[in-house]
Amino acid sequence: MPVDLDNSSTVSGEASVSISSTGNQNPLPNSTGKKKRNLPGMPDPESEVIALSPKTLLATNRFVCEICNKGFQRDQNLQLHRRGHNLPWKLRQKSNKEVKKKVYVCPEVSCVHHDPSRALGDLTGIKKHFCRKHGEKKWKCDKCSKKYAVQSDWKAHSKICGTKEYKCDCGTLFSRRDSFITHRAFCDALAEENARSHHSQSKKQNPEILTRKNPVPNPVPAPVDTESAKIKSSSTLTIKQSESPKTPPEIVQEAPKPTSLNVVTSNGVFAGLFESSSASPSIYTTSSSSKSLFASSSSIEPISLGLSTSHGSSFLGSNRFHAQPAMSATALLQKAAQMGAASSGGSLLHGLGIVSSTSTSIDAIVPHGLGLGLPCGGESSSGLKELMMGNSSVFGPKQTTLDFLGLGRAVGNGNGPSNGLSTLVGGGTGIDMATTFGSGEFSGKDISRRKS
């Protein structure tokens, strides 16, 4: 019995020595100066290098109890377990000679830590290194399906998985924000590069897209020659006019914007004097087969002398044209006076340069005096000339109050001068003069009818 006590005391003494020796292996760092920590895999050159096989490293229970077959990772734990079975147990004691520090190398030949100069100084560290880098990943996370080769890593991940995470568009999960930002920048750059390559490929495969975006402009049509256009339109109108039996050949002339002068009478004094054509307002025909009524030089501004009746018929015999290009009023009257004086016909139409192609006389077309009761015989044209020059006896001292020209003055009362038709036409263009013949000397019965 006392032997047992001595044995127990001896065992306790060995345990104390072992604990003290292990405590001396990790001395406290000096407070005065920090000791630089050795980099991983850079052990002390004097350390003992130990190479273990993969089976030994992966073994969970290296030390097994022979009574209950319970395994332990450390021999010290097994010795303490033996005390429960009342078996002899022995703890390592500190020897007098110094024990060298042990380092462990990785059993994988291709690993950098297989070199003794890069050996790891901890048995647990070398085990975890071998499992992480070269072992099988046995533990899997239930939330993110991530696998781990070390059980401790799996447990640490399971505690924080799903609590705070950053998910990229590509599906990768990150628990740290800095890692997520770095990955996101790389992922965005990669996506942009892929988009550019895809766009370039689509352009090569579909060249029609470029033609749709940049259509070829239509060629500008060549300018049309105005002279040829005039000739073509003139020939067309000539053909159209030739189809009508009443319309003689025409002379086409373009003129500036005309100004109309309308004289309204009660019975159509000059209605039917000219025949209207179906051409545009700038193109017209006359009753003469050789020359136009209003043919003049381009330097004279044209004017249209439109004398219309109260029934709405125009001077040219059509309501479709309200203005016809012609000479100015002053030039028209001067020409009429000159040609009327030199002509033997003595009519207004002959004075204006209109010569009928038929044998019908001027008296048959327009009655004597133009229906105004004026002497206009074939012997002389003094009556009409006087009317045109303003010296006719119509404006003489006759007892009538008829406002013949609609100018607000009494004609024939002798109170003021009158200039006749020359004053009327020479006064300007665009004037409508209403002449009322219902009473007095000039009755509507004296006005001749239009040509049948």
From Swiss-Prot:
GO terms under cellular component: nucleus
At what positions is Phosphoserine found?
53
Superkingdom of this protein's organism: Eukaryota
Task: Recall the GO molecular function terms of this protein's record.
Answer: DNA binding; DNA-binding transcription factor activity; zinc ion binding
Provenance organism: Arabidopsis thaliana (Mouse-ear cress)
Protein name, UniProt field = Zinc finger protein GAI-ASSOCIATED FACTOR 1
Region SHR-binding, residue ranges: 176-188
Q: Where are the zinc fingers (CCHC-type)?
A: 166-189
Chain residue ranges for the region called Disordered: 1-47, 196-254
Q: Which residues bind Zn(2+) 1?
A: 141, 144, 157, 161
**Description of how the protein assembles with itself and partners:** Interacts with the DELLA proteins (e.g. GAI/RGA2, RGA, RGL1, RGL2 and RGLG3), acting as coactivators and with TPR1 and TPR4, acting as a corepressors, at the promoter of GA20OX2 gene.
Q: Return the PANTHER family for the record.
A: SERINE/THREONINE-PROTEIN KINASE RIO (PTHR10593), ZINC FINGER PROTEIN GAI-ASSOCIATED FACTOR 1 (PTHR10593:SF188)
Q: What happens when the protein's gene is inactivated?
A: Plants lacking both ENY/IDD1 and GAF1/IDD2 have a decreased responsiveness to gibberellic acid (GA).
Q: What is the lineage of its organism?
A: Eukaryota, Viridiplantae, Streptophyta, Embryophyta, Tracheophyta
Physiological role: Transcription factor that acts as a positive regulator of gibberellin (GA) action, homeostasis and signaling. GA converts the GAF1 complex from transcriptional activator to repressor via the degradation of DELLA proteins.
How is the activity of this protein regulated?
A: Transcription activation is repressed by gibberellic acid GA(3) in the presence of TPR4.
